């Protein structure tokens, strides 16, 4: 049994880069996955006080149901201005961080994959052992996002503009997966999995 905290690999990338797809491959290898976006949405739609603060700030009204329409309406309003983004981050991220810390403390595996879009923007990279960047051509990134979310190109560009640039993100990377060929991606994930298991040995003692 593991008796100390896991080696933390942060997976980051822009919208539509394919983070969730690659995280799924890691999960097939039994690696614990923590997805900040999923946790954020669950908290936002389950904590009435947080959601009401957001609705009042943005001047919008929508269902409390955690459905796709509500998420799209909310995201469109949030990314209309920098002040809205900063406001959401200020009230939501402390709660999300607390939840993530609790999840990590209960992990019984040598390492975890923490999927977060705002790793660099929020200075969260200081809390991880290694950074895995998922990189993709901007045109593919935009097309994927439009098809997945059924939104306009302008909406996707707004979100991209609020995120750190591709070039700067890559400067933080210890490891990079170029998300183009799925068969190559799987092979790369398997290679990284072995490497992360090796790296994590420095951080663990096993209670036999």
From Swiss-Prot:
Keywords for this protein: ATP-binding, Coenzyme A biosynthesis, Cytoplasm, Kinase, Nucleotide-binding, Transferase
Annotated positions binding ATP: 16-21
UniProt GO cellular component terms: cytoplasm
Top-level taxonomic group: Bacteria
Signal peptide (from-to): none
Biological process, per Gene Ontology: coenzyme A biosynthetic process
Cysteine-cysteine disulfides: none
Chemical reaction(s) catalysed: 3'-dephospho-CoA + ATP = ADP + CoA + H(+)
Domain DPCK span(s) in chain numbering: 8-208
Principal location listed in the UniProt entry: cytoplasm
Compartment(s) where it occurs, according to its Swiss-Prot or TrEMBL record: Cytoplasm
Enzyme Commission number(s) from the entry: 2.7.1.24
Pathway the protein takes part in: Cofactor biosynthesis; coenzyme A biosynthesis; CoA from (R)-pantothenate: step 5/5
GO MF: ATP binding; dephospho-CoA kinase activity
Functional note: Catalyzes the phosphorylation of the 3'-hydroxyl group of dephosphocoenzyme A to form coenzyme A.
Entry-linked NCBIfam families: dephospho-CoA kinase
Family under the similarity heading: Belongs to the CoaE family.
Name the UniProt record assigns to this protein: Dephospho-CoA kinase
Source species: Wigglesworthia glossinidia brevipalpis
């Amino acid at each position: 049994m593991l008796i100390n905290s896991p080696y933390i690999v942060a997976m980051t990338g822009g919208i539509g880069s394919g983070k969730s797809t690659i995280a799924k491959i890691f999960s097939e290898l039994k690696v614990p996955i923590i997805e900040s976006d999923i946790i954020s949405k669950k908290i936002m739609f389950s904590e009435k006080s947080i959601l009401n603060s957001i609705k009042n700030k943005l001047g919008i009204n929508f269902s409390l149901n955690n459905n796709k329409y509500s998420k799209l309406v909310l995201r469109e309003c949030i990314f209309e201005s920098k002040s809205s983004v900063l406001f959401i981050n200020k009230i939501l991220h402390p709660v999300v961080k607390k939840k993530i810390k609790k999840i990590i403390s209960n992990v019984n595996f040598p390492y975890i994959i923490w999927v977060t879009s705002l790793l660099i923007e929020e200075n969260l990279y200081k809390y991880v052992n290694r950074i895995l960047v998922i990189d993709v051509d901007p045109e593919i990134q935009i097309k994927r996002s439009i098809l997945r979310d059924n939104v306009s190109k302008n909406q996707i560009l707004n979100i991209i503009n609020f995120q750190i640039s591709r070039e700067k993100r890559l400067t933080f990377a210890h490891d990079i997966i170029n998300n183009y060929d799925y068969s190559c991606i799987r092979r790369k994930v398997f290679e990284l999995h072995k490497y992360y298991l090796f790296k994590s040995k420095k951080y663990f003692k096993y209670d036999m």
